[in-house]
Curated annotation (Swiss-Prot):
Optimum pH is 8.0. The gene is ACER1. This is Alkaline ceramidase 1. Pfam families: Ceramidase. It is an enzyme of class 3 (hydrolase). Its cofactor is Zn(2+). It comes from Homo sapiens (Human). It is found in: Endoplasmic reticulum membrane. Mainly expressed in epidermis.
Length: 264
C-alpha cells in the first residue's frame, strides 16, 4: 500500500493528463487554477471589514479557511496524494461548518436548541470534529457530510428566496445558484464524460470548476450575510456593493452597512 504522502496515492484522478508540463506537478491546470482563492480571500477580508467589525470577527476565519482550501487543493492536484485529497475535503468541511455557525438563522436551528446560537456552534463544532476523524478511517464520510450541508444550505436559500421581497437579495440568490449550477456541471462533466473531453483534447473543466467556485463563494457569503441581517442585525441597513465598481457588469459583491427582529 503506497504512503498517503506518495504521488498518485489517491484513488481520485481527474481528466487532465498527468505530468504533462512538469515532473513535479501532476495536474498543471488543475493546480494553478486555484490562484483566485489567494486573490479573492484577502480582497474579501478587506471589503467585508466594516461588516465583520459589526457582526462577528469570526468572519475572518471563514476567509482564512477559503484560502486554505486553495492551498490544499493546489497540493492535492500537484501530487494526487491521498493526504492532499483528505486535506482538501476537510478544509471545505470546516469552511462550511464555520459559515453555518455564523450565518444560520436561528429559526432553522433544531428545536431542542431553543434558538441558542452558542449551543448550535458547539453542535456544529462537535459534528465537524467527528466527521473529520471519521474521514481518516472512511474517506467517504466526508463526501456524505459535504453533500448533506450543501443540500441543507440550498434548502434554506430556497426558503428565503420565497419569503423575501428584497430585490438585491433575490438577485444575489439567482446569480449564486446559476454560478453554482454551472460550476457543478463542469465538475460532473469532468468526472463522467472524461473520455469525450479527452477525444477533443479539452482537459480544463475541473480547472473551470475551481475558478467558478472561487467566484460563487463570495456571492454565497454575501447572500447569507443579507439573510442573517434580517434576523440578527435589526435596525441596520445593508447595501450590496460590487468591486471594483457598481456600474460594471461583473464584480465581486460585498456589503456596506448604512444604518425589527424578524421571525421565520
Amino acid at each position: 500500500m503506497p504512503s498517503i504522502f506518495a504521488y498518485q496515492s489517491s484513488e481520485v484522478d481527474w481528466c487532465e493528463s498527468n505530468f504533462q508540463y512538469s515532473e513535479l506537478v501532476a495536474e498543471f491546470y488543475n493546480t494553478f487554477s486555484n490562484i483566485p482563492f489567494f486573490i479573492f480571500g484577502p480582497l474579501m477580508m478587506l471589503l467585508m471589514h466594516p461588516y465583520a467589525q459589526k457582526r462577528s470577527r469570526y468572519i475572518y476565519v471563514v476567509w482564512v479557511l477559503f484560502m486554505i482550501i486553495g492551498l490544499f487543493s493546489m497540493y492535492f492536484h500537484m501530487t494526487l496524494s491521498f493526504l492532499g485529497q483528505l486535506l482538501d475535503e476537510i478544509a471545505i468541511l470546516w469552511l462550511l461548518g464555520s459559515g453555518y455557525s455564523i450565518w444560520m438563522p436561528r429559526c432553522y436551528f433544531p428545536s431542542f436548541l431553543g434558538g441558542n446560537r452558542s449551543q448550535f456552534i458547539r453542535l456544529v463544532f462537535i459534528t465537524t470534529v467527528v466527521s473529520t476523524l471519521l474521514s481518516f478511517l472512511r474517506p467517504t464520510v466526508n463526501a456524505y457530510a459535504l453533500n448533506s450541508i450543501a443540500l441543507h444550505i440550498l434548502y434554506i436559500v430556497c426558503q428565503e428566496y420565497r419569503k423575501t421581497s428584497n430585490k438585491e437579495l433575490r438577485h444575489l440568490i439567482e446569480v449564486s445558484v446559476v454560478l453554482w449550477a454551472v460550476a457543478l456541471t463542469s465538475w460532473i462533466s469532468d468526472r463522467l464524460l472524461c473520455s469525450f473531453w479527452q477525444r477533443i483534447h479539452f482537459f480544463y473543466l475541473h480547472s473551470i470548476w475551481h475558478v467558478l467556485i472561487s467566484i460563487t463563494f463570495p456571492y454565497g457569503m454575501v447572500t447569507m450575510a443579507l439573510v442573517d441581517a434580517n434576523y440578527e442585525m435589526p435596525g441596520e441597513t445593508l447595501k450590496v456593493r460590487y468591486w471594483p465598481r457598481d456600474s460594471w457588469p461583473v464584480g465581486l459583491p460585498y456589503v456596506e452597512i448604512r444604518g425589527d427582529d424578524k421571525d421565520c
